[in-house]
Amino acid sequence: MAVRLMKQCTCLLREATRLVPTVAPVGRLRLAGVACKTLTSSVSSPSSGSLTELLGKEQVFTPYPEHQEVDYLIEKATRPEELLELLGGDHSLHHNHAALILIRLSYLLSEKPKEKALLVEDARFQQLVRLVDSQITSVWHGTLVKLLRSLYTLVLPQGSKELRSVEQEVRWRLRRLKYKHLVFLAESCAPFMKEQHSKELLAELLRHLERRWTEISDSRTLVSMMTMAGHLSESLMNRLEDKCLELVEQFGPDELRKVLMTLAAQSRRSVPLLRAISYHLVQKPFPMTKGMLLDLAYAYGKLSFHQTQVAQRLAADLLPFIPSMTPGEVARCAKSFAFLKWLNLPLFEAFTQHLLNSAQDVSLSHLCSVLLAFARLNFHPEQEDQFFNLVHEKLDSVLGSLEPALQVDLVWALCVLQQVQVAELQTVLHPGLHTRFLESKSPKDQSTFQKLVHINSTALLEYPEYKGPFLPASAVAPSPSPSNKKMTPLQKELQDALKALLGNNDTGSLEVATQYGWVLDAEVLLDAEGHFLPLRDFVAPHLAQPVGNQPLPPGAKRIAFLRWEFPNFNSRSKDLLGRFVLARRHVLAAGFLVVDVPYYEWLDLKSEWQKTAYLKDKMRKAVAEELAK
């Protein structure tokens, strides 16, 4: 055994002595370690590899050379010519230098597209690209990912062999790259990969980012990934949201803003993450700038995420900034709170005052945005006359020249706020405008036409001096509601209670579609004694196609039941949104007594008897209030 061991040691030492001259100086110490390791391991492992194989494996990762003069020349270069001259000079370029020159070239020409085009045609540049291609396997990881970004920004031809070579090298190394390098690729190269048909590289990059998501340890990387790459992969975004929940305590106000804006841009209503962010916004007294507050309000509004304490803080923190806001920022802020359905009276009064103070600088588009926000929330400012005088003054000469859908939106908003003028009604009810919406089948155009029906109803019911034009009778005829439309719990319970109350189909109707663009939950007729009358026997002017012909008997009352769901109200309020205030006003103007059935009252009713008694009591109160007038 000892003799065999001595023979093996002698062979290994002879081989090591022969190989020493071929090893670079920086590797000599490493060689000793390798030889020693080989000697010891060969005793216990007869299958261990030869020294040559170990040396080959050891030399795969060459050490980064010391900083040379050429490195300083590359870093200090201010003109492309200085960099290209390095190729033909006496400088010794190692395997990274050519790539570094390309990276520096792309930086110098980042905002000079004309010079980029000339550079790509330069023979020296083409020589440089070929040199990089020949050395690509020796380029270090960090330099390689920057090189790919630089080649994209230099706009090489899509079929460029050298570009494809760099992309392929990146693909081969993806598994070995650090996560920060993957993040760099996602941040800087993903848009180019999509545009330049490098979809395989992009897909593989996203797979590696998703598999290694647990390596994210800092908030900056996480937020950057959500912003730059989250929209490219649903599964990756899900992982990033999970990581956000883990790291959200480390976020500062700007990082919270970026996450919220990313969620808003992708319309991702991630409730657990939104709750966590809201908690930290409320609990931590972050100092926030005007821009941050505006972005937060926009994101919460876009995602329709209602959090009372956050909305209160945003409104309170924004109030001191209003005098310094531009009209555009006021419009954006008002729209955000309108989407949130949050009416903060001091804030909205400040909006009004600021617009009146800067009336000369307010553009029509910004004023329109504020008007639509006011209408959504049914907000009537204290300086109502001055504000609407400004609105009419701005609209007076240009309303008819605006985009048709915008014309309808503006006049509809004025109808909601009871500030519309006859000339404005005539502009949007003109046959030349409504025909295009009547014939269209797109949901957006149908929604606009529904607003036209509401405007037409306003003209009919609230403006007796208005003489026309009106929408044609065929246009206002309600279309049949889809049979598969899902009923809300309140709607179903209310219908069941009404059926139990009425008992007979002749004494009431459910889901009554009127010619005014509104649907009544139920309609009944009461005589002077308070007894039900058969509906079908009497005239019904609110229907597009009346069924009866007898006039109502003296003292008879027509009653409409209107249910109000949770989304019909301003947030944390019992005040209806503007659209539903308009509906109630129209129903009253059409000659009905209204029985309101709000969700917050209905929820307190547990038994069928309570629900029936509630409806009877509401009818008696409606009749008593009418008689008391």
From Swiss-Prot:
GO terms for biological process: mitochondrial mRNA processing; mitochondrial RNA processing; mRNA metabolic process; regulation of mitochondrial mRNA stability. One of its GO terms (cellular component) is ribonucleoprotein granule. Keywords: Mitochondrion, Transit peptide. Residues 559-617 form the RAP domain. The keyword Transit peptide applies. It is found in: Mitochondrion matrix. SMART domains: RAP. Its main location: mitochondrion. GO terms for molecular function: RNA binding. Pfam families: FAST_1, FAST_2, RAP. The keyword Transit peptide applies. Belongs to the FAST kinase family. Plays a role in processing of mitochondrial RNA precursors and in stabilization of a subset of mature mitochondrial RNA species, such as MT-CO1, MT-CO2, MT-CYB, MT-CO3, MT-ND3, MT-ND5 and MT-ATP8/6. May play a role in cell cycle progression. This is FAST kinase domain-containing protein 4. It comes from Rattus norvegicus.
